[in-house]
Amino acid sequence: MRLKAFFKKVSGCIPFSDCRNVVFGFFSQTPFFVLKTGKNPQWNKSQCCVNIEENCYCLLVTQNRRKDGCLMGIYLNPGNNKFKRAVNSDIYVDKTGLIKYTNSIVDTLQSCVCVSRPRRFGKSMAADMLTAYYSKGCDSRELFSGLEIAKDESFEEHLNKYDTIFLNMQEFLSRSSNVKELLERVEGKVIRELKKQYPDVELYDENDLAETMQDIFAESECLFIVIIDEWDCIFREFKHDKAAQEIYLDFLRDLLKDKEYIYLAYMTGILPIKKYGTHSALNMFDEFSMIDPGPLAEYVGFTEKEVEALCQKYQMDINEIKNWYDGYSFEEVESVYSPKSVVSCMRLGKLGNYWNQTETFEALQIYIDMNFEGLRDDILSMIAGETVPVNTRSFTNDMTTFRTEDDVLTLLIHLGYLGYRYADKTVFIPNEEIRSEYVSAIAVSDWGEVSKALKNSADTLQAIWQGREEQVAEGIRQAHFETSHLQYNDENALSYTISLALYAARNFYTVHRELSGGKGFADIVYVPRKRFLDKPALVVELKWDKNAEGAIQQIKEKEYCRSLEEYKGNLLLVGINYDKKTQVHTCKIEQYRKEESI
């Protein structure tokens, strides 16, 4: 309960028609009394005032109520301060359009929604926003004025109209030693505030939250909106405690499923709802995840248009930002950026890996080191820029049940370490920020020569710039890996090896596979980024069981450099061959001379 206290010099007749009791006392030999607000006076109803002597000081203590009599609580009808801080921040991207969707589903069969996203993708901000909009404990009209939702016809209809319960399960978990204690704390805290708001309602069981809400609804027809943040923290903290997980799911089912008093239920977390075979605890929820966010895709992260506006304001290169933080793609929205990383980049004015501020690479290492056939090879293929097919249907939405490589890859989608294309059911590493996380994880893992090659890739790139052909060949040899599904027997497989050997080149170049130019397609072309125009462009041609000199000759004959005319005079031709018999890589490097025709 929040209290307002103030001293007031009074005399005469003092009305207290909404007071529970009067407490008299003395302070420094001065009499005072305390007025406490409430609905049921404990005195004679005919008494409506108290006469006190002149110059008596009165300590008035009142609960923090809105003008309509609604209490503002911590869990029941919170205020809008958290969302106000977000709106007042240096960078705020308006995502209030989400409210238009939730307004469209209130009081329908689709009124239960579970939204899952990776860490730092704005889940809590969305929950705070919905709370600020629906809660009866605050007046948010001014806060939302000027934002997108204020233009919608549903804005006034639902603004601050409902008893809203907001629960951050991580907060309760941090103060609980087990799930049972957590649920007792949740019920106790919320019921206490419900009793203050509805003191006249007779409750059947004051320790049962669902029963309490049902009793209040039966007497007052009050509709509740329930917003749960970090709903899945139990599954991340108690990974192996299946019994505790089921108890938690059953609690949510009893609280939310088929209840007349639920007007809207909105849950958000990292993982989708846990599957327990035929146990359909929360099957009333519509789920929107990183696999298929549906109509909520534009609220997963920042869109292209939103990032372009930020780049213009903060004078950042959109292409660089795109390379580092873009890559999440959905049917409804083709380009989605990692919001926390974009905000950090804009505020600090420099590109970098901001992902590791939310989670260390060891979290990724645990999963890519798992012993599933094909997993390591697929990770390497994706680091090299390839996509990999995946079946997401067998994943049980927890962090311990892995039966196949597909289950591991699916978890990495939900954690944000992989992007997913719904159309062709493939996964990929979305951007350079995430790619660097994989390289960091591999560097401390037992991945043999691959780990060494990635660490030495900067030296291999430097060797190309300096024309040291034998050192380049040695760097490629280190990156040479055997796979089951990508046999090292053609130029395509060789290209994966080159991509790993030259991983460090991504810091300086935009990499193009099969780039059209002249009379055909160059195998790999490295185009310098705007910040590194002093670096030479690289045209790499690969040969299998032939010779490196022939690769250089093909670049010239087919005029692959024609599309790179602006780099004339600062262009290196790189030919690489793998001899099947000797199992030796050879390299030939030649500078494209200015006088040669492009």
Identify the role of each PLM range.
Residues 498, 522-526, 535-546, 558:
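Conserved catalytic cores of phosphodiester-cleaving nucleases, focusing on short active-site segments
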Residues 478-512:
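Acidic-basic catalytic patches of nuclease active cores, encompassing PD-(D/E)XK
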Residues 548-552, 559-589:
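Nucleic-acid nuclease catalytic cores
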